[in-house]
Amino acid sequence: MKSLFSKMSQNKTTCLHFLLILNVSVLSATVVQAQSSSPVNRIIENLFRDSPALGTFTRTPEMDIDFTVIDEQYGEFDINDVRKVLVDMRVNNRSPIVAPIVRIPLAARDAPQDVVRQLLDAGVFGIMFPDIETQEQATAAISSMRFPQTADADQVPPGLRGSGSGSAPGYWGVSEEEYRTQADVWPLDPAGKLVAMIQIESLTGIRALNEILEVPGIGVIFLGPTDLANSTGAEGPNAPTVEALVQEVLQVCLARNIPCGYPIVANSHQEAERETARRLAEGFKVLAVMTRAQ
């Protein structure tokens, strides 16, 4: 962990840095080795290997990380902006080493199919869905990421992505046929290379959590304590009432063997390191560590 925050301190940009640490000791899936011509989603690869994966929410990752979340939640969504980031992430005109994930606009939460189709057709490796509050929204999220399934595949949730794949096969560096066999959500499809990250950010979402988790294909449940505080009238994300709800969600996820995530905001690398260790000890499997230190 010390080396992680040493890397953070070397970055001199003025924005906040977001590092995601996936500790996945509870997962027991068997490794599915990718063909040499296939892209590697390092989130999934590390999950299978029972190793942490490091990521960031910045558009221009400068460190040796496993993935980056391109944040499109705020402002006007523009697929061309995302495509430019994806091009910049390629290495020697080959599929990126850092797996690109996109957080979609909140306005697309209830009907994400069109936005998600554009993003997947561009070649992203996963989608983060903000403020999911119902089983129906979670189902729509997973369905939007799946092609219509063949008779011998899992039919639930049904795939609504459509029949085309855009430029994604070329971005991944695989054939159209290879892409279609790999472009499904993990862990519902153990060989899938797409990750669905579901954010729970309200009391309504927490109350519906058990129903939400009945939806197959969820890769990560990620908490939003600041928005949770706003939805409950608490003074802030560290309020005891918010912390109690955070622990409630964590216990549900642990019982269901689903990685649970939490964002840490720290004023120094040392504080971030301490909080990271504490949350990992509690059982969180995904941590977004934010530090304001320069």
Predicted regions and their residues:
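Hydrophobic alpha-helical membrane-insertion segments, chiefly the h-region
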Residues: 27-29, 224
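Compositionally biased, low-complexity segments
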Residues: 2-5, 21, 32
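Expand to "…catalyze enediolate/carbanion chemistry for C-C bond making/breaking, isomerization
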Residues: 34-294
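Bacterial N-terminal signal peptides
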Residues: 17-27
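N-terminal secretory signal peptides that target proteins for export/translocation
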Residues: 1-13
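Residue-level detector of solvent-exposed, low-hydrophobicity positions
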Residues: 12, 25, 178-179
